């Protein structure tokens, strides 16, 4: 896909990633103060992580901005999102490439997945919801401690 530009945004890119700058249409930014200007220009977010721990905020940020995400199982495991939530879980490089090309070529599907992604974040990853759960848990601990 010659018209596609790939932006690799994030701190501490490896030497192997930095060398990708030599490829036409590949931009490696390194650390940026705010990822949103890059996301607002994107059609799809990709997360080809082989190792990931916990929730990947970068994925939730992309989903919140109505971007479909193609990611590895490792990258998406902490989000608990499924294919009905605007993500494509790619088990192999072949599937990763296929899903990415499909989304790049199909505007309607891309839009639908982006809307699903945003809805998922709104329903499952809002601070108010998590703060309420944390507050309830802390109250339970205080009561349990007081009665112990």
Q: What is the predicted role of each segment?
A:
Residues 5-37, 44:
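Nucleotide-activated donor-binding/catalytic signature segment of Leloir-type glycosyltransferases, i.e.
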Residues 15-17, 35-36, 53-56, 75-80:
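Short glycine/proline-enriched, acidic/aromatic patches that form the donor-sugar handling elements
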Residues 30-31, 47-52, 74-75:
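Short Ser/Thr-rich beta->loop micro-motif in glycosyltransferases that lines
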Residues 40-54, 65-67:
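Acidic donor-binding loop of glycosyltransferase active sites
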Residues 58-61, 68-72:
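Short hydrophobic beta-strand element within catalytic cores of glycosyltransferases
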Residues 73-90:
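Short acidic/histidine- and often glycine-rich active-site loop of Leloir-type glycosyltransferases
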Residues 87-94, 102-107:
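Conserved acidic donor-binding segment of nucleotide-sugar-dependent glycosyltransferases
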Residues 108-138:
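A charged, aromatic-enriched C-terminal amphipathic alpha-helix characteristic of glycosyltransferases
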